[in-house]
C-alpha cells in the first residue's frame, strides 16, 4: 500500500501540493482586484454587500462572487483595523468556504482568516455560526472582527452562557452568531422542548466554522450533551457502595485496565462483593443497578485521581478539563460517576440525574448543510475527520517560514532523574534570559515541579485550573526575558505569547481618545516603531497632560523593545515538555506556542519510563535496553528506537480513543434516528395550528389496533366484543355493537372497523365543535406536546438503563450493539404506540370549563433541567407553559384540575 502511495505521489504530487494548485489561481483572481478596491470610496465599498445580495437573489452562486467578496473584505479590514489578509489567509478562507478544515499554525491569524468565509456565506441570509471553545473567545473574536462587519452592514450576535431567551433570539437572528459548542448544542436541545414555535431561538443550521476544531470535534466527542432533571433515587447507595471498595483487593478481586480506563471485577471479586453486601447473586436482574454503582465506585477510586482528573474545592468535586487544564465549575459527570467521586471524597452527594434530552457533538454538527473548521493541528486526525464528518484537512503554508528548532526527546529511566534534568535545563535557560514555557499534563505534576523550582530559588508562574483567574496576566508575562511559566495543557488557550512580554502600550493607545493631528501621528509612529519621530511629536504637543501620557507610552515601548531584542538574542521562547500527551497534536499545540510569525524559538520534551504513556503503552524492550546498558543514574538516552516506540505508543492511544468515539457514535446513531422522528413530530405540531388530521390518523390507528387485538378474523362469533366495548366506554363512546349485525357482511372485520372508526371520528368532531374550534386546537396541541415530552423522557430513561446493562449479553456471545439496536427500536415502537393511545384517550375525556379563556402565549425563557456537557451537568429551573382549566371524567365523578405542561 505504501509503495502504491509513493508512486502516486511522484506522479500526482503530494496532497499538500495538489491542494495548493487548486487554491493559487483563485488567490490570483482576488489579488487582481486589489488595485480596484483601493481606489473605491468608503461608501461604494460598504454598498458591496447589497450588490452581492442582489446578485445572489438573481441566482448567482457564492462561488462566483468569492473573488470580489474576499477582495472587499481584505480592503475593509485594512481600512478599519490596519490588517491586510496575507495570500495564505486567502487560501485558508477558500478552504473554509468549501467546507474543509484549514490547518494553520499558531500565530498565522485564523480569526482574521475566518472573516472571509464568514462574510461570503452570511450573504445567503441563512445565518452563519462561528463556534469557539469558551465564552471569552466568542466575545473577544466577535468584538475584534466587528469593525469589518459593521463597515459592510453585516450584523453580529454573540451567545454567552448567562443570556436570557430574548438576548439569545436576537443573537441568532444576526447574520453572524459567535458562541461556544456547548451553547449551540444546548440551545438546539432546548428548542426541541418549547411549547410554541416562537419560543425557539435558533434558525436553520446552514454553515458553521468551528475554531479549534480538533478540540471540539475530537477531544469533546467522547461524551454527549445532556439536559437532565433530578431523579427521585436516594443517595444512600453511594455511601453504602463506597464503604466496600477499600475492602476489595487489587489483582485478586479486580483488575485495573489503565489503557481503557476501566476496572473489571474478577469472579472472586464478585463473590467478595456479594458476601459484603449480603446478596446471593450480584448479576441477578434486580441487581443491575447495583452492578453499575459498584463499577462506578471502583472507577472513582482506582482510575480517577484527585488533582489530575478533578479537584476538591469548598466541599465540591470539580472536574478538570483534560485538554485545556481548566476547572469546569458547575459541570458533573453523568451515570452516577460524580456521586461516586463525592462519596470517595466525603463531600455532600448530589442526587443522580435523569436524561430529558441529549445529543453528541458528532450528530449535532453533522446537521449543518456545510461545516468547516480551523486549527493548528488537524493533520494527525485527518482520517477521523474524513470518516465521521466528511471533512478534508487542507494544510495551509505559513506566511513566514517557521524558525523554531525542535530537538529530539530526552528519555530517563525514572521520573526523579527526569525532573532533575528539567531543573538543570531551566536554570541554564534563565541564566541567558531565554523565556521558557514548561508544559505539564496534570495539576499534580505542575505542583510537584513548582515546589522543586521554589526550593531551588527559581521565580516562576503557574498556569493551571487552580490559578485560572490569573491566566491573562500569566500569559502576558510568559514572553519576558528569563520568564519561567509552568502551564497545564495549553490547548484552546487562544492567546499568543509575545516575545518581550505583552505590548501593553497598544491598549494605552486604544484608550487615548484625543484625536487631534499630533496625537494621531504620534500613535501611527508608535505602531510603526518609528520612535525618534514619536519623540519629536511629543515636543510639539501643546498640552503638558498630553506630553506626559505620550512620554509614558513611549517609555513603555522602549522597555518592551529592549525586552523583545533580549529574547530574540537568547533564542526566542523555549518550550519544555515534561511528558508526552496521549495525542500527538496536543504535543504539537504546545510546540506551536513558540516560533509564531517567523519568530525564533526552540522545543524539547523530557520523558521517563515511569510516565503514564511509556508505562501503559510503551514497550518493555526500552526498559530492558536501559538496564542492559547499565546506564548510570541521570543518564539520558537518545535513540531512534525510543523515538519510534513513543510514536507507536501515541498512535496506539489515538487509535484506541478513535474507537471509543466511533463506538459512542454507533450507539448515539440509534438514539439519533429516534430523536429525528420525535423532533420532526414535535416540529409538525409546533408549526401547524391545526393538527386534526394527525389526531384523526391516531384515532384510526387506535381503532385498528383494538379491533386486531379483540376481534381477529372474519368470524364474529369468536370476537371478544366485551373488551372492545370496555375500551370504547373508556373513551366515553357509547356505540351499539352486535355480532349479528356483521355476520352477513362480506368482510365482517372491515365493516366493524369502519363503523367504530366513523363513530370515533364523529365523537372527536363533536367535541371540537362543542368546546370551540380555537380552544380545541390549542388544547390538543398542548396535550399532544405534554404527552410527547413525557413519553420521550420515559423512553430516554429506559434507553439509559438498557445501555447500562446491555454489555451483559456479551457473556452469551451476542453483539451488545446489535442487541441495543434491536431492543431499542422495539422499545421505541412501544413508546410511539403508547403516545398515540394516550393522546387519543386524553382528548376523548378532557373537558374545558365554562370560564376558561384562551391562554396567553408566554415568551419568558428559563433553562430546563440540568445541562450536562461532555457528561457534566449544570442546574437550572423548569419552563412554565400556557394553562387551560379542564375537567377530566374519571369513573362516575369529575375531577377539576389545571392542565399544565409537566415540570421535568
UniProtKB/Swiss-Prot annotation:
This is Protein translocase subunit SecA. SUPFAM superfamilies: Helical scaffold and wing domains of SecA, P-loop containing nucleoside triphosphate hydrolases, Pre-protein crosslinking domain of SecA. Gene3D superfamilies: Helical scaffold and wing domains of SecA (1.10.3060.10), P-loop containing nucleotide triphosphate hydrolases (3.40.50.300), SecA, preprotein cross-linking domain (3.90.1440.10). It comes from Leptospira borgpetersenii serovar Hardjo-bovis (strain JB197). It holds the Pfam family SecA_SW. It is a peripheral membrane protein. It is found in: Cell inner membrane; Cytoplasm. The gene is secA. The keyword Translocase applies. Its EC number is 7.4.2.8. Belongs to the SecA family. InterPro entries: Helicase_ATP-bd, P-loop_NTPase, SecA, SecA_CS, SecA_DEAD, SecA_motor_DEAD, SecA_preprotein_X-link_dom, SecA_SF2_C. It is an enzyme of class 7 (translocase).
